[in-house]
């Protein structure tokens, strides 16, 4: 039963990270379409924001694996 819970936690963390990055990329594409001259600035912010959006799911997956292997 614990394995199922850990699998669900890891899966939901991965889905959450993917949705977060997709929202960031969508906003950058919309911003670039509105103001093409700001493309560089928006890309830089995206390259900073995407890893931040992925950090929490990565930590959640690490915690799930720790619970699996240690518990």
UniProtKB/Swiss-Prot annotation:
Annotated PROSITE patterns: ATPASE_C
Subcellular location: Cell membrane
Keywords for this protein: ATP synthesis, Cell membrane, CF(0), Hydrogen ion transport, Ion transport, Lipid-binding, Membrane, Transmembrane, Transmembrane helix, Transport
Site (described: Reversibly protonated during proton transport): 54
Spans traversing the lipid bilayer: 5-25, 47-67
SUPFAM superfamilies in the cross-refs: F1F0 ATP synthase subunit C
Principal location listed in the UniProt entry: membrane
GO cellular component: plasma membrane; proton-transporting ATP synthase complex; proton-transporting two-sector ATPase complex, proton-transporting domain
InterPro entries linked: ATP_synth_csu_bac/chlpt, ATP_synth_F0_csu, ATP_synth_F0_csu_DDCD_BS, ATP_synth_F0_csu_sf, ATPase_proteolipid_c-like_dom, F/V-ATP_Csub_sf
Family: Belongs to the ATPase C chain family.
Alphabetized NCBIfam families for the sequence: ATP_synt_c, PRK06876.1
The protein's name in its UniProt record: ATP synthase subunit c
Native organism: Shouchella clausii (strain KSM-K16)
């Amino acid at each position: 039963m614990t394995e199922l819970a850990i699998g669900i936690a890891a899966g939901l963390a991965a889905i959450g990270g993917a949705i977060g990055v997709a929202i960031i990329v969508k906003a950058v594409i919309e911003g670039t379409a509105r103001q093409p001259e700001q493309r560089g600035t928006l890309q830089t912010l995206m390259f900073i924001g995407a890893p931040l959006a992925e950090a929490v799911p990565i930590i959640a997956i690490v915690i799930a694996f720790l619970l699996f292997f240690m518990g």
